Structure formats: structure tokens, C-alpha cells
Amino acid sequence: MTEQKYIVALDQGTTSSRAVILDHDANIVSSSQREFTQIYPKAGWVEHDPMEIWATQSSTLVEALAKAGIRSDELAGIGITNQRETTIVWNKETGKPVYNAIVWQCRRTADICEDLKARGLEDYVRDNTGLVLDPYFSGTKVKWILDNVEGAREDAEAGKLLFGTVDTWLVWKMTQGRVHVTDYTNASRTMLFNINDLCWDQKLLDEMGIPSSMMPEVKRSSEVYGQTNLGGKGGTRIPIAGIAGDQQAALYGQMCVEAGQAKNTYGTGCFLLMNTGQEKVTSKNGLLTTLACGPKGEPAYALEGAVFMGGASIQWLRDEMKLLAGAEDSEYFATKVDSSNGVYVVPAFTGLGAPYWDAYARGTIVGLTRGVNSNHIIRATLEGIAYQTRDVLDAMQADSGIKLANLRVDGGAVANNFLMQFQSDVLDTEVHRPEVTEVTALGAAYLAGLAVGFWDSIDELQDKAVLNRTFMPHHDEEKRNRRYKGWKRAIKCAQVWSELHDDDDEE
């Protein structure tokens, strides 16, 4: 029998699908990535094609193996991590989606959320799912599909349709329709899962008109869910052994497995998570209570603050504003000036997430004067990412009563030294950047590897977390507080705009 030398992480993100292959020392030996189409049918609507998600994800695995000359029988297992909340409904008989995937960023269900609030469900949702009633989560997206796609509700009630977040869709495709599962971390992001009883919430399913027959079975984040045949019929059978939503996978990859440990991922959005162990902390400051992974992949509680626009605001500078040739250029231009010249950029392009939860706020640039140039705008955009992180961290520390000694960071934007230093300054906290910043993939690989015995224990993995750099805070307290006060004023401007806004303005 061939020695199983490798573990695979499939990392299905908002803009691309990736496959990462790791060896026993948790070194990345091969990877492949493919971007896929972003679909914007109307203002504030965001969709993906589920078949394109599957095609790009499956092809990256084949490419990653081929790049390194690795045979499928050398793989010990596969872990999956995914963009969360993004909603797919498909026909289990044909295997075809009934509609495009509705992406977590999509705001089309704001009116459904307002209706549920009017029916008095806001407190019930918070107390039982840990979430706020917001279009961000899966529940209202499922309802929208059933209400708006011809024949969908009838087929759902006849037991023909299945719902899944992206992990569920991938596992279903990889097992050729044999396995319909999700894990606790992804289930906790649907606004349909009771995090007190750890089961689907029948009251919420009934309130949204979603048949329970559509829902996947919920399992731990580290166990064997099924096998996939690599190479088609008669190919090598590889266990699918780990699933976690991208942010919980990153928390695990950073080895934040004990209460009080926290990380921030700077991806499309920014996501700050703090593990609270077996204690469910209910936020009084606009944060979410969600499920994460304990040391063995068992469900644990966490506090989360979600910022919708992180790295995506740098992409906006590049793609829409044409101020950058490449996202990596933002650091160079930001450091060409010694301040943002009084400018604040609030990137509320799809509303504001934690701790504000304002679906109607919109992007705002304030403080413009005649002396402001493009470098100031670029710098202010990067600073806006850091300020949003402070908004969340302040709320998190207030809820938990824990003052963080440091913040562990990961994601594409952490390569930006200006952003990381400014983050440390605005938080007055050490920022720790790991040597391997692919911690989302690491987390999925670790969960799968532990389930199949590729690694023996969490202790074996703790030693693999090597720091690349520690950023120390520089700013004095008076300067820090003055600048943050300006940010809070800018946030108010973004929110007041929505209060004054009329749909006729866009005609």
C-alpha cells in the first residue's frame, strides 16, 4: 500500500476556488487557484453559478496534484472550508440548482428581514441562533428562492429540493449525491440553527416556510463524512474528513482553540472571531454568537464581528476607481503621504456589518478638501479597514470582559505592512502575523488530518504556528483617540445618508 503523505484542503472562497496540498510538517507543497464569475443582476444583489463553483473547485484539485506530481493514493484525506451563508438550492433528482447561489454579500432580502422583525422575531433569532436578523444569513435567501423561483415551493414541499451552504453542495457533488451534510460552524450561520440545542430550529423553518426535508444533517467539523472517488469510477477513494466555514477554519488554523484567543481575517470582508469555549456569550454590543471548533473539532462557542468590506475595498480602488494597477500597490501609495489629510473612507458599499448592522448605509468619503489627492484616498481606504476592526474589537472586549494581549491576523491583506502597523496603532495592541498566512486552508487540513489519524493530536499542531512579524503600537493615546473620534463621525455620515435617501434619487 502506498504511504499516505499528504492532506488536501479545498478552500472555496467568495472570488476564487483553491486547492492546497500539505505534507506531514504542514508545509504547503502544491496549490492551485481559479477565479470565477461574480454576477450582479441588480444593485445590491450578488450571485454565483453553483456549477461554476463546482467546476473550478474540482479542477483546482486535479491541477494541484499534477503540479507536484502527487498521486491520489498518496492523499490521506480532504478538508473543506468555504465562504459561509452563501445559499444553494438544488433538485436532488436532477442534481441541478434551481437558481444561482445567493452570496452572503447580497442584500435582496432586506424587506423579508423587516417583515420578520415586524412579526416580533428579532429577539427569538438572537436568543436561539446567536445572529441578528439580517440579509447576510442563509435563511431569508432560501425563503426568497422558494418564493420567487417558479415551481420551487411546490417541489420543496414534495421533498424534491435540497438546501446547502457551499460545503454541503461540494460534499454532495463529490459523493455523487450520496451525502447531504454540513458541520456545526456552517449550520450556525444559516439563521435556521438553534445553537442552544444544536439542531435545526423548527419554529424558524416554519416562520420562513422552509420544509425540514431540505436541511442537511449536521456533524462535527472533524470526522469522516463520506468518500470521494478521485479519477472517476474505480478511482482512488479518499475520505472527506473535515468541514468548517472559512472564518472558523482560520480560527482553528491559528490554533485559537481555547477561550479568549482571537484572530482577524482580512479577506473580501474582515472577520474577527474570539473563542469563548463552552460558554455562550450573548453580545450586548452588536456582535454575533456563533459556533467554532474546540481542540478536537467539537462545537465550541465564539463571538464574531463581521465587516462586509475589507480587501474588497482595495479591489474597488483598483477596479472601479482605477487608482491602483494592482492591489499590492496600495501600500506604496499610502506611504507617499504622511496622513490621510483629514479624509475618512467608509466602505459601506453593501451596508454596515458589526457592530452597527445597518443594511441601508452606503459608502461615504468625508473630509475632502482642495489639497486631497489620490494617495490620501488610498491611505484613508486602508485606514478604514483598520478602524472597522477596532469597532468590532472594542465591542468584543466589552462583551467578554477580556483585554486581548495580541491579535492574530491572516488573509491576503496582511501582506500590507502599512495596514498591519496602522492596525496595531489604532488598537493599541500587538498584531501577530504568522509565517504561513494560509491559515484557512491550514484549519481545514488540520481538522481532516486529525479525523483520519494523519496527525495524532492538537499538541502536534501547536508547534507549527511560527510568527513572521510582530507589529507594536506606536501612536500616542491622544492622537489615537482623536482620529478614532473622526472615524465615528464618518460612520454617522454613512448612516444619515440612508435616512435621507429616496429611491427616486437613483432614477
From Swiss-Prot:
Binding site for sn-glycerol 3-phosphate: 14, 84-85, 136, 246
Species the sequence originates in: Vibrio atlanticus (strain LGP32)
GO terms under cellular component: cytosol
Keyword terms: ATP-binding, Glycerol metabolism, Kinase, Nucleotide-binding, Transferase
Similarity annotation: Belongs to the FGGY kinase family.
Family matches, as InterPro entries: ATPase_NBD (IPR043129), Carb_kinase_FGGY (IPR000577), Carb_kinase_FGGY_CS (IPR018483), FGGY_C (IPR018485), FGGY_N (IPR018484), Glycerol_kin (IPR005999)
Stretches assigned to coiled coil: none
EC number: 2.7.1.30
GO molecular function: ATP binding; glycerol kinase activity
Pathway: Polyol metabolism; glycerol degradation via glycerol kinase pathway; sn-glycerol 3-phosphate from glycerol: step 1/1
UniProt-listed HAMAP family: Glycerol_kin
Any Pfam family hit: FGGY_N
Regulation of this protein's activity per its record: Inhibited by fructose 1,6-bisphosphate (FBP).
Reaction equations catalysed: glycerol + ATP = sn-glycerol 3-phosphate + ADP + H(+)
Name this protein carries in UniProt: Glycerol kinase
Binding sites annotated in the UniProt record for ATP: 14-16, 268, 311, 315, 412
One GO process term, biological-process aspect: glycerol metabolic process
Binding site for ADP: 14, 18, 268, 311, 412, 416
NCBIfam families linked to this entry: glycerol_kin, PRK00047.1
Superkingdom as given in the UniProt entry: Bacteria
Protein's job: Key enzyme in the regulation of glycerol uptake and metabolism. Catalyzes the phosphorylation of glycerol to yield sn-glycerol 3-phosphate.
Binding positions (glycerol): 84-85, 136, 246-247
